[in-house]
């Protein structure tokens, strides 16, 4: 019952998490004091540490008490035992494969479409992923992150536009980035691959550094 106890304790602990919102004049930043997350955020992700530990996302290493929901043939949906939000899921691949976006981009789109009430996001292997050696996404309640609701305020003039598909710069909110607005999954894929190809890849890194957040409307 260890995994269940950890999960239950940490979800219960969310009730005591301290949250403070800062009004930045047109947008907000929300800070969260959540001590239980140190296990995840403080995880060692250097090559030696990854090699010496068992992968905690591989099915054979999951506690028998860990409930899992198969998603297609490639993924499992798990309750995150170290949650940030009341509804927080980790969605790893069943097969141990590195955290890279291109091989699982189509899965990213399908997951988001099937989990429409949620925001699905991806942290790159050097951009915050606590398991850079095992491909996974996360899903949280849509609207619980300020950017979900505020993003439309900060996209104005598009960089590129083809029919109803656009790339916007995201500026003025201390979270610079790019926003893809696409009418179809095929269009979203074409635009994303153009952006991906233009991003720099640092020496020794497997892909450009990135964090991705996706919603289906």
Show the residue positions of the predicted features.
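Short, small-residue-biased leader/transition segments that mark boundaries at the very start
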Residues: 2-5, 217
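Catalytic metal-binding acidic patch
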Residues: 93, 133-140
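Nucleotide/phosphate-binding site architecture used for ATP/NTP-dependent chemistry
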Residues: 49-76, 105-106, 162, 185-189, ...
